[in-house]
Amino acid sequence: MKLFIDTANINEIKEAYSWGIICGVTTNPSLIAKEGRDFKEVVNEICSIVDGPISAEVISLKAEGMIEEARDLAKIHKNVVIKIPMTTEGLKAVSVLSKEGIKTNVTLIFSAAQALLAAKAGATYVSPFVGRLDDIGQNGIELIKEIVQIFRNYPDIKTEIIAASIRHPIHVIEAAKAGADIATVPFKVLEQMTKHALTDIGIERFLKDWEKVPKKN
C-alpha cells in the first residue's frame, strides 16, 4: 500500500517526504485555508517537493465550473490530480475530464455504490472517508473492504482506492489489511506510526550499555 500525506503545510510535507515513505499529497479547501496563502502558489510549491500525485480540489458545484477549474489546475503541473466531490454534477465532470486525460480523485465517498459510479465515470482514484463513517457509528474499514472486493471482481476497473479521513495508526493498518491501494495520512498520525514505548526503552538501554564500554584515552 502506498502512503500519501494529507496536508497543505509545506513544512510537514518536507519532513514526511524526507523520511522516504510518502509518494503523494492530498489537499482540500479547508487545509489550504489554514495556510493563509494563495491556492495555486501552495499547489505549485507542493509539486516542486513531491514527485507524485498531488490532489487539489475544485470548489464549483456545477459540472461546467468543475471542468473549467480542473483544466486550469491541471496546467500547474503534470502531477496535479483534480479532487471532485461525489455528486451527479461531479460524475459529469469526471466523465469529461477522464476523456481529456486529466486525472481525478472523487472525494467524499461514503458508500460502495458511490465508489462504483465514480469508477464507471472514469475516476483515477476514489476516496472513501473512514473516520467520518466511524464518527456516525458505521464502519469505515468495512466500506474499504466492500470497494476492494467490487473492484477486484472487474479487472477493467483501474480506479485506485485511497483510504481517507484517517484518524489514527490503526486506521492505516486496517486499510492496508483491507487491500486499499493508498492511505492518505495526516502528519500527526505519521508521527504516531513511528513511535512505540518499547522502542524508546530499547534505545535508552542501548545508550546506557554503551556508556559502560571502556573508552581509550
From Swiss-Prot:
Top EC class for this record: transferase
Keyword Transferase annotated: yes
Coiled coil: none
Residues annotated as the enzyme's active site: K83
GO cellular component terms attached to this protein's record: cytoplasm
Gene Ontology MF terms: aldehyde-lyase activity; transaldolase activity
Subcellular location as annotated: Cytoplasm
NCBIfam families referenced in this protein's UniProt entry, alphabetically: fsa_talC_mipB (TIGR00875)
Protein name: Probable transaldolase
Organism: Caldicellulosiruptor saccharolyticus (strain ATCC 43494 / DSM 8903 / Tp8T 6331)
